[in-house]
Amino acid sequence: MTAAATRKLVRAYYERFNAQDVEGFLDLLTPDVVHEISQGGSEKGRAKFRAFLLRMNRCYRERVSDLAIMTDADGGRAAAEFRLDGRYLETDGDFLPASGQRYRLRVGAFFVIREGRIARISNHYNLKDWLRQVQR
């Protein structure tokens, strides 16, 4: 896959994220996708990723902007940096109670691409900053 094709794939990933298009989002992933959650472990497979997306869409309303995508020369790896603006709508597990709190974070993500699809996603953001913002 070329670097340009990888940039297009990663951009499509975030477009579908913004649209909350779960099935379209999953179409971009390999069946055995590995999702490394910021400060929270790792999950494998589309079914687990689907469950993650459905929970996120229920508990949060988020939008990616100011997206910068970088790739290696052959398009096998990519990185993205972006701003994430969100609202915390429904209490998520053991986190603080949700009441529509707004937040804004800088996020970094890393991707491995295999056969034209995303095979690994690793997201990184400052959880302490998020907690500070939603405690207000």
Tell where the protein language model's regions lie, with residue ranges.
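C-terminal and inter-domain tail/linker signature
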Residues: M1-R136
